[in-house]
Curated annotation (Swiss-Prot):
This is Phosphatidylglycerol--prolipoprotein diacylglyceryl transferase. The lineage of its organism: Bacteria, Pseudomonadati, Pseudomonadota, Betaproteobacteria, Neisseriales. It is an enzyme of class 2 (transferase). Pathway: Protein modification; lipoprotein biosynthesis (diacylglyceryl transfer). One of its GO terms (cellular component) is plasma membrane. Catalyzes the transfer of the diacylglyceryl group from phosphatidylglycerol to the sulfhydryl group of the N-terminal cysteine of a prolipoprotein, the first step in the formation of mature lipoproteins.
Length: 287
């Protein structure tokens, strides 16, 4: 059985300034966005320029931070932030929500499209294949931090991992389950899925490969966006069955988690967009 390495959350210390791994992974995601975006631009068949890509990143970063934080507040911890409203602005404390960040990026894409006289789908279809590797970097940051660990699994499974950071939650689970209590007494923590790495694979690497291949030739307007919505929604829905569920606005449930509730509209919206795109397949645009 594996044990989480318990990495130092600080990647680089420069005097009084500390750069944390999680923040560094966000930076990696933004750099990958620029690198992959420039690769697409150099291939041609796109209205985007390097200058437009830089502007798009600026708006995207604002959308990720503002939307991600607002999503964390509204979807996952509304009661806590109602009692501690000033902590809403402490983005380094308490995390951010992907689904909130996604909505923030949609709003940023709409504003960018209006400012540059582009179709909204031109922007989102261009962005879709640039996002997954950034998501993978973020999930890798979660793993390095030893947070958002997976659900309990049997200790004899080759993928079982002990997360010492989860001891508080482990104690609560062990108190109500004799089998868990035995495992906790034996190992000092409960064996869990390393669900962050599953998300790196499915939401990041696999989704990137699918979208990069799909956008390698011109597609009907909105199709790349539809593939992202459906692909991410399904990947997240599956991964949530291995991830320890968060307590959201619908309570704490092991049957269907908050992340799954939020992924269902993405899958539905993607299916609707795909059908709309097929009916307008003659309305193509350059990547």
């Amino acid at each position: 059985m594996l044990t989480h390495p318990q990495f130092d959350p600080v990647a680089i210390s420069l005097g009084p300034m500390a750069i944390r791994w999680y923040g560094l992974m966000y930076l990696v995601g933004f750099v990958l966005f620029i690198v992959l975006g420039n690769v697409r631009i150099r291939k041609g068949n796109t209205v985007f320029t390097p200058k437009m890509l830089d502007d798009l990143l600026f708006w995207g970063v604002l959308g990720v931070i503002l939307g991600g934080r607002l999503g964390q507040v509204l979807f996952y911890e509304p009661g806590y932030y109602l009692d501690h409203p000033l902590e809403i602005f402490m983005v380094w404390k308490g995390g951010m929500s992907f689904h909130g960040g996604f909505l923030g990026v949609l709003a940023a894409s709409w504003l960018f499209a209006r400012r540059n006289h582009l179709s909204f789908w031109q922007v989102t279809d261009f962005v879709a294949p640039l996002v997954p590797l950034g998501l993978a970097a973020g999930r890798l940051g979660n793993f390095i931090n030893g947070e958002l660990w997976g659900r309990v699994t049997a200790p004899d499974k080759p993928w079982a991992m002990l997360f010492p950071q989860a001891r508080g939650e482990d104690l609560q689970l062990a108190a109500g389950n004799p089998q868990y209590a035995q495992w906790f007494a034996q190992y000092g923590a409960l064996p869990r899925h390393a669900s962050q790495l599953y998300e790196v694979l499915l939401e990041g690497i696999v989704l990137f490969v699918v979208l990069w291949w799909f956008t390698s030739r011109p597609r009907a307007r909105g199709q790349a966006s539809a593939v992202f919505l459906i692909g991410y929604g399904i990947a997240r829905f599956v991964c949530e069955y291995f991830r320890s569920p968060d307590e959201g606005i619908f309570g704490h449930s092991y049957l269907i988690s908050m992340g799954q509730w939020l992924s269902l509209p993405m899958i539905l919206a993607g299916a609707i967009l795909w059908q709309w795109s097929r009916r307008h397949a003659d309305n193509r645009f350059l990547r």
